[in-house]
A protein has these predicted regions:
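Extracytoplasmic ligand-binding site segments that recognize negatively charged/polar headgroups
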Residues: 1-92, 106
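Solvent-exposed loop/turn segments at secondary-structure junctions
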Residues: 1-2, 19, 27-31, 101-104, ...
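Soluble non-cytosolic domains of exported or imported proteins
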Residues: 2-6, 25, 59-63, 82, ...
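Mature extracytoplasmic/periplasmic domains
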Residues: 136-213
C-alpha cells in the first residue's frame, strides 16, 4: 500500500484491498467520516465547513452516504468493534477504520513481529473525539468523584494511563510532554496542545497529531431527532455482509443436514422392515 492510497477515504472502496478492509461497527463514527468525503468539494469551495457537516443529516445527505457505503460494503471483510486491530497485526487486514489508541496498540504489536503498520489521517478531513469523567447532577458521593477526577488528572497518572491504553489525556502538563518526547520521531507542531512555544516537539503523531492535521479535523455531534433515520440507513448498509465463502459454508451445512435427515429416515425405514420380517 502506498502513502497516496492511504491519504484518502477512497481507500475503503479501493478494490485492490477487497476482503482486507475492516470497518468500525459504529454508525456515528463511519457516517461522520464519510460525510466529509461525500461533501469534500463543497468544503473546498467554501460553501460549508467541516463543523457544519457534522449536522448534515437530511434525507439527501443520508442517501449520499448510503450510496457511497454501497460501494464499500462488498469489499468489507468485517464490521468490528475490537478485533480489527488483531487482524491488522496478523496481516489478515490491510485497512482498518480505527480509533487512534487501537492504532497505537496495533503498530506496537506489529513491530514486534516485523510487520510495518502505519496510521493515516485522510486529506478530506476526519473527526476527533474524547471521553470525559463527569459527575452526575444527582451523584451521592461528589467528594469521592472529585478525588477520582483529580487523581486521573495528575501528570504521573496521566503518563501511566497513556502508556497503558494508547489514548492521550487532555493534560498538557510539561511532565506529560517530556514523557512522550522521543527523538525517534520528526519534530511536529504541538503548540495547540501544550504551550505556544512547543512548535517542534519530537513526539508520536498518532498520539499527538501535528497542528496542521488537527486543523483538518472536526467533532461529531448528536443526531437528535434524525438518529432513527441514520440507524436505519446503517442497518440497510450492513445488512447481510456474507461473502461467497460464507455462502458456500452455509450451502454445505444445509446439504449436510439434508443428507443426515435422508440417511436417518432411510435407516429408520430399514429397521422397521427388518422387524416386520422377524
Amino acid at each position: 500500500m502506498t502513502d497516496e492510497e492511504a491519504s484518502t477515504w477512497d481507500i475503503v472502496r479501493n478494490p485492490k484491498f477487497a476482503d482486507r478492509i475492516f470497518i468500525k461497527d459504529s454508525a456515528r463514527d463511519v457516517y461522520s467520516q464519510l460525510i466529509l468525503k461525500v461533501k469534500e468539494q463543497e468544503v473546498a469551495d467554501g460553501k460549508v465547513t467541516m463543523d457544519q457537516l457534522m449536522n448534515f443529516t437530511s434525507d439527501a445527505d443520508i442517501a449520499a452516504v448510503e450510496e457511497y457505503m454501497k460501494e464499500v460494503k462488498p469489499l468489507v471483510a468485517g464490521w468490528e468493534a475490537d478485533f480489527g486491530k488483531d487482524q491488522m497485526v496478523q496481516e489478515l487486514g490491510y485497512v482498518n477504520l480505527t480509533w487512534s489508541g487501537d492504532g497505537v496498540w496495533a503498530i506496537d504489536e506489529a513491530a514486534e513481529l516485523g510487520v510495518d503498520l502505519r496510521y493515516a489521517l485522510p486529506k478530506e478531513g476526519f473527526t476527533v473525539w474524547f471521553d470525559g469523567w463527569v459527575i452526575p447532577k444527582y451523584a451521592q458521593n461528589v467528594k469521592a468523584a472529585s478525588y477520582w477526577i483529580n487523581f486521573m488528572s495528575r501528570p504521573d497518572i496521566v503518563i501511566r494511563n497513556v502508556e497503558e491504553t494508547g489514548y492521550v489525556s487532555v493534560s498538557g502538563a510539561p511532565e506529560v510532554r517530556d514523557a512522550f518526547t522521543d527523538e525517534e520521531y520528526d519534530p511536529i507542531d504541538l503548540s495547540y496542545f501544550f504551550t505556544p512555544a512547543d512548535t517542534a516537539v519530537c513526539a508520536n503523531p498518532v498520539l499527538y497529531p501535528d497542528k496542521a492535521d488537527i486543523e483538518r479535523s472536526t467533532q461529531e455531534h448528536d443526531w437528535g431527532e434524525n438518529t432513527t433515520k441514520l440507524i436505519e440507513m446503517w442497518s440497510r448498509v450492513k445488512g447481510d455482509n456474507a461473502n461467497a465463502f460464507t455462502y458456500i459454508l452455509i450451502g454445505l451445512f444445509v446439504l449436510a443436514i439434508a443428507a443426515f435427515a435422508f440417511f436417518a429416515r432411510a435407516s429408520k425405514a430399514r429397521r422397521k422392515k427388518s422387524r416386520r420380517r422377524k
